[in-house]
Amino acid sequence: MTQTTDETVPALDLSDFDDTVRVQDDLYRHVNGAWAERTEIPEDKPMVGAFVELRDAAEAAVRDIITTVEPGAPGSEAQKIADLYASFMDADAVEAAGATPLAEPLAAIAAVGTVDELVGLVGRHTRQGVRGLFDIEAESDPGNPDRYVMFVGQGGLGLPDEEYYRLPAYADIRTAYRTHVAGSLALAGFSDAEAQADAVLELETAIAACHWDKVRTRDLRAMYNLMPLADFEASAPGLPFATWLAGLGMSEEAAGELVVTQPSFFTDVAGLLTEDRLPAWRSWAAWSLVSSRSPYLASAFVQERFGFYGTVLSGTPVLKERWKRGVDLVEGALGEVVGKVYVERHFSPVAKDRMDTLVANLIEAYRRSISDLAWMTEETKARALDKLGKFRTKIGFPTQWRDYSTLEIVPGDLLGNVARATEFELQRSIAKIGAPIDREEWLMTPQTVNAYYHPLRNEIVFPAAILQPPFFNEHADDAVNYGGIGAVIGHEIGHGFDDQGSTCDGDGRLQNWWTDADREAFEERTKVLVAQYDALSPVQTPDMHVNGSLTIGENIGDLGGLSIAHLAHHIAQEGREPEAIEGFTAEQRLFLSWAAVWQTKARDELVRQRLATDPHSPAEFRCNQIVRNVDAFYAAFDVRASDELWLEEDQRVSIW
């Protein structure tokens, strides 16, 4: 039986509002200020807010599914769920095992005597879910988006990003990281853990120096380097890539052509793969193994890992309960099995119908907006409209569910189950290489509170779990839904026309469909938006700024999303003027709903980490900086030059 939105859930929760803050000065804190004042971040979380609360609800729903699933025959999907969860929840068995599960793989690392053996071992580790030196996935070929091709990219780091290894601002984190590495290796039985940790940090610093930075990796053209395997191997002498493939369980023939996303990384890392560095590489491999396995080992390992990744990096003081971590494991390994039941219990057909209408109106709003753009030539408009017409939309859940029949889950074998689940997913990915694209595949489960745009498939996807308040409320007025899920839809469509998506055509092919003049006009507008965000500093971290170049794609998505949602709401009204509700006009309610979506309270440590690594701007700016660029917001609330949110008209950015 599907569940619909509770009719008692308010469309706008006025108890969250802070009327001491004028909407014209700070929309975000006007709508969320009272909520922020009374809300404490749970001790097992780095943040709380609209997204987190929905994720908590989804987590509880998944736990209910896992713990109430009817036992099935051995090997059935139901039994796999039960056995995997039980293997994690048997804390006594995990504690009794201690560090013993690490003994055999650590001995294999210690026995490595050549670079070739090392690279083969790293390949095997990658296959089994251990952090590796390279990332690998099968994805649409940007030059021929009807087929899958193998992508390989940079990896090998235990810190969040390459800049953590080089910038003075992260010196304290580097010290804490070294202490964590030493502590983990000591738990694993290393008597020289301090020296091993020094070797790990030194080697990872060298690996980080080979990495492309975050902004450079946003350039899809620079990242698309299709080449035969032989050419790739010739470009990175000293890197026995075929040995790594063999470790993965993949032949050179199966790899065929591949896309090398950061070619210089492989060339430079090959220079680090020398016999004299083997001791350091063994230390790094041991650390990667221990770190990756720690969440599934005895509590001393779990707490050691959480102390750094949870507390130092994110500020979270307390590890979340074991059942929540068990749910995470099942979600990662058997997500679509759980998703089938989640949809049956929690997805309303009414939501699907209203979403279809919302999407249709957002598409029409984009069509009208593109047609009326003054800065774009008719030639490029025609191609933009062609791309818009080819958008594919997926709502709620997949029409074809993933087949887990070959995934073996063994009762009581937690680490084995983790390794087999990772290997199953890797082999499923590798098997796609060279095959036609599966257009029905989803890259998120229905119980995921998120949405995405895929530039190489030109599709927007909205899982069932995001179709809940404050994003979507089937009992709410249109204005609230257009300011919430409507802007999310517009945001995802907008990614098709952001700095990355605009380099792909309607078929997902990496191809320039712009005139030079139009591309220049587009980039002039995006430069202004980059500069706006570069100037912003969160209240919590005034010593740090938003990286406008890193966040430009999401900022374009937000700006287009809200602007087009506003237009789509007008289309939906068909000339009618909606009545005011709770003292607010429909125009005002749309913008108030937009602000409610970004309701967030985060720990300082997490804010700092996200400013350094996240392509999304902080919530307060996703709300406030966007409305400063939207003329309709000024009209809705009579914003004037003396108000804090005022932005001079010639400084406002309008792209789509």
Where are these regions (language model features)?
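Intrinsically disordered, low-complexity linker/terminal regions across diverse proteins
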Residues: 2-5, 235-239, 259, 263, ...
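Active-site-surrounding "flap" and adjacent substrate/cofactor-binding loops of secreted or lumenal enzymes
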Residues: 5-8, 19-26, 30-93
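Conserved phosphate-chemistry cores used by DNA topoisomerases
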Residues: 11-14
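Short, solvent-exposed loop/turn and secondary-structure capping segments
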Residues: 38-42, 137, 161-163, 211-213, ...
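Short secondary-structure subsegments characteristic of cysteine-rich extracellular domains
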Residues: 43-66, 193-210, 481-487, 582, ...
